[in-house]
Amino acid sequence: MKGNVLIMAGGTGGHVFPALACAREFQARGYAVHWLGTPRGIENDLVPKAGLPLHLIQVSGLRGKGLKSLVKAPLELLKSLFQALRVIRQLRPVCVLGLGGYVTGPGGLAARLNGVPLVIHEQNAVAGTANRSLAPIARRVCEAFPDTFPASDKRLTTGNPVRGELFLDAHARAPLTGRRVNLLVLGGSLGAEPLNKLLPEALAQVPLEIRPAIRHQAGRQHAEITAERYRTVAVEADVAPFISDMAAAYAWADLVICRAGALTVSELAAAGLPAFLVPLPHAIDDHQTRNAEFLVRSGAGRLLPQKSTGAAELAAQLSEVLMHPETLRSMADQARSLAKPEATRTVVDACLEVARG
């Protein structure tokens, strides 16, 4: 092995999945990858399954915490810093890559105190608290979307690391001529109940002759009631609690209605898919709206704020594009033009460049 690399990412799939893509690239180049996470995040399931050693530190966020937690926070942060220092001194990594989550704060500071080159990557169009704090001390600051960070010599716009099988060329789908449009509705692994309620009502108002084929991922807790909503309004739909093969789902789809998480937006570009984007209204710093605007500005997507989009409005917008397939083709081309197939390699290149000094 050429040396150890320490990846820091935790909490949600939006941080962990891009980090796993980077881990595979490091391994392909002959490096041993270790992972720094927290005991409660999704990394506790995904990282061991990927065969990577997972080191845990105790750290949590401060937003929305009560006075008692805030008083205890400095001691807890100091404890997590010492835990991260211990891991880094044990591993002696050639570089540390942080992709977000609470773990990256103490982990990034520990890297700096140990003189280990630090690279950070921000998946969203608005930088998270940890990455904003670490940007001044990082050797490279990678961003998925342009201008997330202030301009500097160390800023690098890379895109988001996305699984290679999601990248589809313009000929991967059957032509739209002579068939129904395929509509994919995604609410994330837990489902998005506002979408589960809105879509059946809206699609019932779309004329039958242009109504799309529907595949709706509703979440495990909401799949049965969502299917019943479709039956109630006499709309045929394939409702699933979860979609495990996203590559196949994207290859089937012609249009997607979904939230605007950073990874979802990047996957839409990779798959060359037009989208109606309904950002999560309570996302921190409204980052999902900013993510969505990346597609909307280029004509690859339409922004539908949850608070102001009713069934009639959604039905009208759907009917417009369903009656004019050339609009969907144009949106798909624009989405494909935004894809960053080299994102994973670019992030890893940046890490190894600073590791070499």
Swiss-Prot record:
Name of the top EC class for this enzyme: transferase
Cellular location(s): Cell inner membrane
A molecular function GO annotation: undecaprenyldiphospho-muramoylpentapeptide beta-N-acetylglucosaminyltransferase activity
Major localisation: membrane
Binding annotation for UDP-N-acetyl-alpha-D-glucosamine: T12, G13, G14, N124, R163, S189, I243, A262, L263, T264, V265, S266, E267, Q288
Membrane topology, from the record: Peripheral membrane protein
This protein's record includes keyword Cell inner membrane: yes
Alphabetically ordered keywords of this record: Cell cycle, Cell division, Cell inner membrane, Cell membrane, Cell shape, Cell wall biogenesis/degradation, Glycosyltransferase, Membrane, Peptidoglycan synthesis, Transferase
One of the record's GO cellular component terms: plasma membrane
Pathway(s) served: Cell wall biogenesis; peptidoglycan biosynthesis
Biological-process GO terms, alphabetical: carbohydrate metabolic process; cell division; cell wall organization; lipid glycosylation; peptidoglycan biosynthetic process; regulation of cell shape
Enzyme Commission identifier(s): 2.4.1.227
Pfam families: Glyco_tran_28_C, Glyco_transf_28
Catalyzed reactions per annotation: di-trans,octa-cis-undecaprenyl diphospho-N-acetyl-alpha-D-muramoyl-L-alanyl-D-glutamyl-meso-2,6-diaminopimeloyl-D-alanyl-D-alanine + UDP-N-acetyl-alpha-D-glucosamine = di-trans,octa-cis-undecaprenyl diphospho-[N-acetyl-alpha-D-glucosaminyl-(1->4)]-N-acetyl-alpha-D-muramoyl-L-alanyl-D-glutamyl-meso-2,6-diaminopimeloyl-D-alanyl-D-alanine + UDP + H(+)
Record family assignment: Belongs to the glycosyltransferase 28 family. MurG subfamily.
Protein function: Cell wall formation. Catalyzes the transfer of a GlcNAc subunit on undecaprenyl-pyrophosphoryl-MurNAc-pentapeptide (lipid intermediate I) to form undecaprenyl-pyrophosphoryl-MurNAc-(pentapeptide)GlcNAc (lipid intermediate II).
Full protein name: UDP-N-acetylglucosamine--N-acetylmuramyl-(pentapeptide) pyrophosphoryl-undecaprenol N-acetylglucosamine transferase
Gene for this chain: murG
